[in-house]
Amino acid sequence: QIKFWGAAYGSFLRPCVPLFVMITGALLLPLKDDTSVFYKKRISRVFWPFLIWSVLYNLFPWITGLLGLSPEVILDFFPYSGEEVARQSLGISLRYIAEIPLNFSIVDVHMWYIYLLIGLYLYLPIFSAWVEKASEKAKLWFLLAWGVSTLLPYYYQFVSPYVWGGCSWNSFNMLYYFAGFNGYLLLGHYLRNHDWSLNKILL
């Protein structure tokens, strides 16, 4: 039952991240600030709340033990956390905290999005330089290649796990560099800045 409702809620909310990335592209591309100013303003605004909340989430299992609460409390919040978290060990919590620069832990899985967001912010000044100079046709070609890349997981699932140069020792196939959330950035920018008037569309 947990898996069913988790899948139901997840499917309903799944579009939120791509939509947010599209809004980011619509509002920020092309960048108006200098690269150093942009990094200081955007990344610092995200980094410190992310770090504080990640630490608190990873300390949560240990804090429940400190308060004398049952490990079942942890499973109520994090059903997939497993036996390691249920030990309520400070050592395990500290190990999770030490691994924050590398990845999220089993108790702060939802923080995956912040790693994505920081990566997009690091990438934006470089992408912005291209967006500012690129023609509409070039942007449409990028979006077409990116759109095809979004269909590849279905190909992997139902046809073959490898295509266009991909194999067991090379995951960088032909459209690899068009794939990912950068397409949502450009799509948001394009939808906002394209002339959608009826006359323009008919022409």
Regions found by a protein language model. Name each.
Residues I43:
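Active-site helix-to-loop segments that bind/position phosphate- or nucleotide-bearing substrates
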Residues S197-L203:
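Alpha-helical transmembrane segments and terminal signal-anchor/GPI-anchor hydrophobic tails
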Residues F20, L29-P30, F60-L66, F78-V159, ...:
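Hydrophobic alpha-helical segments with transmembrane-like composition
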Residues Q1-F4, P161-N170:
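Membrane-interface interhelical loops and short amphipathic "cap" helices
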Residues Q1-L31, V46-N58, N173-M174, A179-G180:
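Functionally critical transmembrane alpha-helices in membrane proteins and complexes, commonly lining
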Residues L29-K40:
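Transmembrane-helix boundary and interhelical linker motifs in polytopic inner-membrane proteins
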Residues P71-S81, W164:
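Extracytoplasmic catalytic-loop and juxtamembrane helix elements of membrane-embedded
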Residues G68-S70, L203:
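N-terminal low-complexity, intrinsically disordered segments
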